[in-house]
Design a protein with these regions (language model features):
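Long, amphipathic alpha-helical surface segments
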Residues: 1-19, 25-27, 34-36, 51, ...
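Surface-exposed patches in mature extracellular/periplasmic domains of secreted proteins
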Residues: 18-21, 73-84, 122
Length: 146
C-alpha cells in the first residue's frame, strides 16, 4: 500500500498538529490523530506542548503499522484487494479502530464479494457516515469509482 498517499489523505481528514491537544472526546492527541497512551513519552504532557516533526512522523508510522495489522485481521485478503479499496479501509480503520469497523458486516460482505457499490451502500447506511459526512462522502465516492 502507498503509505504516502494514505498519509496525505489522513492529513486532510485528521489534520496534523505539532502540539498536544484534546480531541473531540477530550483525549490527549498530537500529530495526525495520534492518541496519546501511557506508552508514549508525551503521556502527561500539557495541552499546547510542542511535539517535533520527527516524533509526529514516528507516531504516524507506528499507527500505520497497527492500522494495517488490524486491516489484515478484519479482511484476511486485505493485501490482495485493489489499492484503492485498501486505502479506503485503512482510512476508516484509522478513524474508527477495529472494534467499530468490525461492525460494518454488510460492507465486509460487499468487499468480500468485490461488489464495491454494495460496500459503499453499507458505508452510507451507518452512524459513522452521519458523524463524519465530508470524510465519509469522499471515501464512499472512491469506493464507488473502483
Amino acid at each position: 500500500m502507498d503509505l504516502q498517499k494514505l498519509r496525505k489523505q489522513l492529513e486532510i481528514d485528521e489534520g496534523v498538529k505539532y502540539e498536544v491537544y484534546k480531541d473531540h472526546l477530550g483525549y490527549s492527541t498530537f500529530g495526525i490523530g495520534h492518541l496519546v497512551t501511557s506508552h508514549d513519552p508525551e503521556y502527561g504532557w500539557s495541552v499546547g506542548t510542542d511535539v517535533d516533526e520527527d516524533r509526529v512522523i514516528a507516531a504516524f508510522e507506528q499507527d500505520c503499522q497497527s492500522v494495517l495489522q488490524d486491516c489484515s485481521i478484519l479482511y484476511e485478503d486485505f493485501d490482495d484487494l485493489p489499492e484503492e479499496v485498501q486505502q479506503v479501509i485503512a482510512n476508516m480503520m484509522f478513524n474508527m479502530g477495529r472494534p467499530r469497523l468490525s461492525k460494518f458486516k454488510g460492507m465486509k460482505r460487499g468487499v468480500d464479494a468485490r461488489d464495491w457499490n454494495a460496500a459503499a451502500d453499507e458505508m452510507v447506511d451507518s452512524g459513522w457516515y452521519r458523524q463524519v459526512t465530508n470524510r465519509a462522502d469522499r471515501l464512499v465516492k472512491r469506493m464507488r469509482e473502483i
